[in-house]
């Protein structure tokens, strides 16, 4: 999880104003388990996510890090930072999911795949 502020430029609505969220991130890696029976050690995965993503995004102003920081663009930004360091002969990054609220999230699976946005109404 990380806390950050942003605003959506060129957007007509309340999100064009400066506001913040507590974002939740899920990173999914697929591949062939190693001799220990793991696709990737949770310790290694958490360390990479902390170093490459959370250390940069937590308590930041996202507009200074990426253009138009929608949940979709945040997921893609995270993908672009993690995909090269997670890819090996036996594993690869499969999906990045970002929750902007408890019931609104997006998933990204890289270039050539459609993104997915979901929200549960209340």
Model-derived regions, located:
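Charge-rich, low-complexity N-terminal segments
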Residues: 1-122
């Amino acid at each position: 999880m990380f806390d950050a502020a942003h605003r959506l430029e060129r957007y007509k609505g309340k999100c064009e104003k400066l506001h913040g969220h507590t974002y939740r991130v899920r990173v999914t890696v697929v591949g062939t388990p190693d001799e220990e029976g793991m696709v990737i050690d949770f310790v290694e995965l958490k360390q990479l996510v902390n170093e490459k993503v959370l250390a940069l995004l937590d308590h930041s102003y996202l507009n200074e890090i990426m253009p138009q920081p929608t949940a979709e663009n945040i997921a893609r930004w995270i993908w672009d930072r993690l995909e090269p360091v997670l890819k090996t002969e036996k594993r690869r990054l499969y999906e990045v999911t970002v929750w902007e609220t408890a019931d609104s999230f997006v998933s990204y699976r890289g270039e050539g795949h459609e993104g997915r946005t979901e929200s549960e109404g209340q």
